[in-house]
Structures are given as C-alpha cells and as structure tokens.
Amino acid sequence: MFLQAFTTCQPEHGVADDMALHQAQRVRDSRGVPEFVFNPRLGETYQEALDVKGNPSIDLDWYETKNKVTGETSRYTVAHWCVTEARFRNHLKKLKPEASAKLIPLDNMLVRITQQDIVYRRYLTPGHRAFIPDFGVYITYEENGKTDYRALSRQLVMFCVERRKAWRMLQSKAGIVNREYIAQKAILADVDAGKLSLEELFARGHELVTERLAGAMAAKV
C-alpha cells in the first residue's frame, strides 16, 4: 500500500507552528497535493487500486466553499492555498475592491487556458485567448472576517493550470470523469469553430461552464 502525505516546514513556508494540520488540509482541498491511497490488493487495474475519495468534489476541478461573512460560495483553488503561506508573497498583491474591475477573475481565466497553451507558450501572446497578463488576474479570499482581493502573478496562474492538469490525470487513473474538463473542452471547441465569441468567453467563462454542467445534469434526469 502507498500513502501520500504532506506537511509544512513552518519557518520556511511562513506558517504558524500550530497550523501544520490546517495547511495539510488546505493543500489537499486546493488540489495542490491531492490525497490518494494506492492499494494493489484491491485489483489489477488503476481504477480498482487507486482511491481519491478523501478529496472534496472528486468529479470537479475545484471544490466550492462558503464565505462566512457574505454567505457567497467560491471555488477554492491552489492560489487560495498560496495566500495562506508567506513563501508565495511575491506572487500575490493586495487589491482594493474597485481595482479588481480591471482584472480577470481567476475562474474565467482558467476556462480560457489549457496545459497545452502553457507548453506551446500561447499564454505569452497578447490577443490569444490564453494570454495571461502578469498580475492581471485576481481572486477573492476571506481573511480575518472580511473579503480581500489579491492579484496573481503569471507564474501563479500557470501553477493553477499545472495542478489542475495533475488532478485531472489522477482522477482519470482512478476512473473518475471530470465534468468540468468535458465542459471546458466543449466550450473551447465552440470558440475555435466560431460558434462562441471570444468576447463572451472572456466575460462569462465560468458561467458558461456552470451552464454546461447544469445542462448535462438535466439531460441525465
């Protein structure tokens, strides 16, 4: 049997001494280091031997958490985990709420970009759907009872894409179909075919994914 575990090095990571358990849970929930158990006694295929059920929302890219202040739901990505560790401070900038209007929500950005866009460096091409502006993407984060806004470096957005890809690979080995991945591929195919404009993709990326997921669920009923 193989078990994967994660723990912080508190001084190096910029984490309080009593937060090791919390950080391990956060990095798991953010898909930074997903939890899995590999037990070959269960069968002769990966689908039988690999267990990822310790992770939240196992058929989606990210899981949703509720803001204790506003009651609103948001997705917990690896960028949100990075906010909790001081070692990533150079990749995060605090924003005033009004300044976020000029930036791209991370949820929308992640629909626009794939791992192949990273490999072929399309994320550096202005005008391409996958272009990532440095500190031009933002997230909201609940801290000390209020909602904070953080701009992300280009490298941190790329980190989100890479961790999402790794999670999708792990899901597939465990025999889990990622519904968001299917929706994203369909949306980008429509963009490439001219059925969906770049303007709508940029403005409604995450909303389009949500609509596709709802439509797929309704079709099953």
Residue ranges of each PLM-predicted region?
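Flexible, low-complexity linker and terminal segments
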Residues: 7-221
